[in-house]
């Protein structure tokens, strides 16, 4: 009788566990292209990240594409960063970008995971916030008040994995700059971002992201950020190759300071192409916590 009761209880436990399924790997990494994804590091997991954006591929004419070797000879921007999982749902990170010699720090908290079955949660939700600091000393305007060097970003990420191939995320975002260059710019910028990932194979995916800035917040010449990427996933590494209209690597800049649509016109009305090659390389490592 004892054995029978034990068997029944174990069977019920397995049955209940099997009735709830959590969606994993909604996106390939904690970044989609430049923007953050709902994914967070596991507890004790660290990630070293190098992000690089080259110069404009197209400069004045088609000849410049090869002359500047697809933008490799142009001005580039790079960010080196380090992330760490405090818990399985909370991660922190920081880095430095070459543009304005900017330092940034962020926190990201996954408050809900997508689940199906006995406990049905149709989406995953993650909160994100960061702070950035301009350390460049060549801009005399920033010398007036120390706090003028700070900017902030706040983001709500809502994502759904529809099947093993398709994932979608939306990102309502607010950025705040303590100092802006002109009166035509708003200190606060509201934007709505959207991203999609489609798995071609278990290790290869294509992704795209776009941020729409609400009208009346930025002066003429500033545009919405967009990007298209390819993700190559291996054990412990994710290599991402991108095409984007922005050289920037943190939301305060790629949302609030991107200039030029991908297909555009220059000041003289001639055809212009604002497109840059870029890449992200990530390396995961274990410092403690979860054992694999």
Place the predicted regions along the sequence by residue.
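A mid-sequence, solvent-exposed acidic-amphipathic segment
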Residues: 165-166, 170-212
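Bacterial Sec-dependent N-terminal signal peptides
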Residues: 1-23
């Amino acid at each position: 009788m004892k054995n029978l009761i034990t068997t029944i209880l174990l069977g019920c436990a397995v049955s209940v566990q099997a009735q709830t399924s959590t969606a994993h790997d909604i996106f390939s990494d904690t970044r989609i292209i430049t923007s953050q994804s709902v994914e967070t590091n596991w507890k004790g997991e660290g990630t070293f990240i190098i992000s690089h954006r080259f110069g404009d591929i197209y400069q004045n004419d088609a000849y410049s594409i090869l002359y500047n070797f697809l933008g490799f000879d142009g001005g580039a921007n790079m960010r080196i960063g380090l992330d760490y999982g405090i818990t399985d749902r909370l991660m922190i990170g920081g880095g430095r970008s070459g543009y304005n010699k900017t330092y940034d720090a962020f926190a990201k908290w996954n408050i809900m995971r997508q689940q199906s079955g006995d406990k049905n949660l149709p989406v995953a939700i993650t909160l994100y916030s960061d702070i950035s600091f301009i350390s460049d000393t060549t801009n005399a305007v920033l010398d007036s008040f120390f706090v003028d060097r700070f900017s902030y970003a706040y983001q709500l990420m809502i994502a759904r994995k529809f099947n093993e191939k398709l994932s979608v995320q939306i990102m309502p975002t607010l950025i705040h700059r303590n100092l802006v260059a002109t009166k035509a710019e708003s200190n606060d910028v509201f934007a709505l971002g959207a991203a999609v990932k489609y798995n071609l194979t278990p290790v290869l995916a294509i992704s795209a992201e776009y941020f729409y800035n609400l009208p009346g917040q930025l002066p003429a010449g500033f545009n919405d950020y967009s990007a298209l990427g390819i993700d190559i996933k291996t054990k412990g590494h994710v290599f991402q190759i991108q095409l984007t209209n922005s050289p920037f690597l943190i939301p305060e800049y790629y949302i609030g300071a991107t200039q030029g649509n991908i297909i555009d016109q220059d000041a003289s009305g001639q055809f212009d192409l604002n497109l840059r090659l870029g890449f992200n390389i990530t390396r995961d490592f274990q410092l403690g916590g979860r054992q694999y």
